[in-house]
Amino acid sequence: MAFDVWTHKDLKSRLRKRSSKQDDQLGASVEAKAKRVTQRSITSFIKIKEKFVVSTSLDYSESLQSSSQTSPKDDDLNNASRPPPFPSSDSVQITSQRQTQLTAFFTCSGEITSRAKFPEAKSNDKKVLSGFTGRKNSGKCPFFKFIPGTSCVVDAFMYGYLPQIQMYFLSHFHSDHYSGLSRRFSRPIYCSKITASLVALKLKVDRRFLHVLELNHWSTLPDGTAVMAIDANHCPGAVMFIFKTKNGENILHTGDFRAENIILQNSVWEQIRIDVVFLDTTYCNPEYDFPEQRVVISQALDFIQAKMKVHPKLLIVIGAYTIGKERMFAAIAEAFDCKICVERLKMQVLNCLDDVPLRERLTLQKKDTFLHVMPMASVTKKKLTEYLKVYPSYEHVLGILPTAWQIGSVKRSLLEPFEETNAVTLLGVPYSEHSSYVELKRFVQSVRPKRIIPTVNASGKETRLSMAQTFSRWLTEG
């Protein structure tokens, strides 16, 4: 089941070079350490067992631990000219036979437990019963956020008080899904452990209202609905929800997900017949036919190595969101055995993943590494040109935008810069955390739900009708 980026075609032979040559431009020989780093789940973060067992209980009382943030001083601009630890493009070694398993997104045992019950709110707890106490209703809540036959909604925090709704579900910690959630929110929120940690850290929501769902385990909600969270292959902490209503209907809400093979290999699909699926249709268009993440990562590593031969003193800047894109920069750090420089707020977020090996790769000191992670908006030609001036020890900066939104042609198989100057190269990488059109089709044909409801880019009646015809065709073909 493990996703091993290093098994991609010819990648080992292209990167695993043992020779240590003198680099005249650097005046020193730099050889990457051939050490094996024992790390968890950056790319193989689901370890699925085919056998489903029934356990007796599930503990929901564990307190969430916020990350312990160290506070080293930021790098001094006066030391910006200090020579960085450049690698030689001819002496890059893979430090491990397998891709670094940074970022322990999930420990997915594949076990279904008996339906442990969540406690109901006490009648004398006015704050709990008061429900949403934050912002006022900011529009009508879309129908696809309500789970039929239950008192549950998914990713619906920006619509104010919703009558008859007892429980709120958060699929992952991206702002378009938690928008409207604040420290004043006082209704039960169900999510993964990582997402709960981020909600507590960043939004200061009272931990009493955060209920952690263990992956691949059934739990019973106060209204009698059973729910199971399963990995969504989207970003750390992202999950899909399967609801089993009191009338026996199985409803899947995907949230945002990437339906690569690792998702289809989850044996839950063999155990449960899905009646209704609320489907992430972000890229439900034949034009969006981008490669699998492991292929994109391999291509990016090839591009970087080739770039280093032209510009040995290369600075690499990768755009990222608050959470997401970890696989991309972790793969680069592993291939070239370097630190990962992140901003202080990003460090706090990554510490919520509770991954010691990842922390060992991280640094706040820009002078310590040539691999910097910055917000997407900072990766532009103008900003990177100015950024390079601050660090004159580098001769060129490669900006990487790992998102399908950033590229002009989503069907191209080879990576090509979309903007390049003497000082800056901008590379759009079709690294998506949403399903491609082909992956959506394969998922639908595999799960074969009775009804499909699109949740993205489906606000118009004509669009919904067109998607319905597409879904019907997929099921007929499959």
Q: Where do the PLM segments sit?
A:
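Acidic/His-rich, metal-assisted hydrolase cores and their charged scaffolds
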Residues: 1-160, 164-170, 184-250, 254-478
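Catalytic glutamate of the conserved HExxH
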Residues: 173
